[in-house]
């Protein structure tokens, strides 16, 4: 069965949000493993790859403090604690995929998926906020890499154009 990663991200968001909510409410029984298992259960067949949900949720959960430190400079007007819990967890998931899964998830997919989560579960302006913050992260992280990539592509195009001109020039001299 094919993997449904979008659904997996929804379950991960739901689990992280539930854990945070229950913990802040003083629920000492809040356990991320049992929350994830409970949230996966109704969707296991449609989901396909349950390991994706576990890996994503635990990856974010294990690095929450570090992710929050990395997010803060990208939204300096908004202390992490003042961002809504949904938006905060969407940002964490998005940044985790951008920075820790860049070999598995293309950056634009990570940003788009986070924006879609924000549209579905956040407030009216959440998607714009998420897009802005993760767009800043993308530029900060890949700015120089993108510039190098663009230069390499331009060089390839110029080389191909020169080769084409060279071929055309040699064909004319043969006539």
What are the language-model segments listed below?
Residues 1-120, 125-127, 131-175:
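N-terminal interaction/assembly modules
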């Amino acid at each position: 069965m094919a993997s449904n990663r979008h659904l997996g991200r929804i379950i991960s968001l739901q689990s992280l949000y539930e854990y945070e909510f229950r913990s802040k409410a003083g629920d000492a029984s809040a356990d991320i493993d049992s929350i994830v298992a409970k949230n996966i259960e109704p969707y296991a067949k449609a989901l396909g790859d349950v390991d994706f949900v576990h890996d994503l949720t635990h990856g974010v959960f294990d690095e929450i403090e570090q992710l929050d430190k990395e997010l803060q400079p990208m939204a300096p007007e908004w202390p992490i604690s003042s961002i809504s819990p949904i938006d905060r967890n969407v940002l964490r998931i998005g940044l985790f995929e951008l920075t820790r899964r860049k070999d598995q998830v293309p950056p634009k997919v990570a940003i788009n998926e986070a924006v879609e989560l924000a549209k579905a579960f956040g407030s009216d302006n959440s998607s714009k906020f998420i897009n802005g913050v993760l767009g800043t992260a993308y530029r900060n992280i890949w700015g120089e890499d993108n510039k190098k990539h663009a230069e390499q592509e331009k060089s390839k195009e110029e080389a191909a154009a020169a080769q084409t001109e060279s071929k055309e020039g040699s064909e004319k001299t043969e006539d």
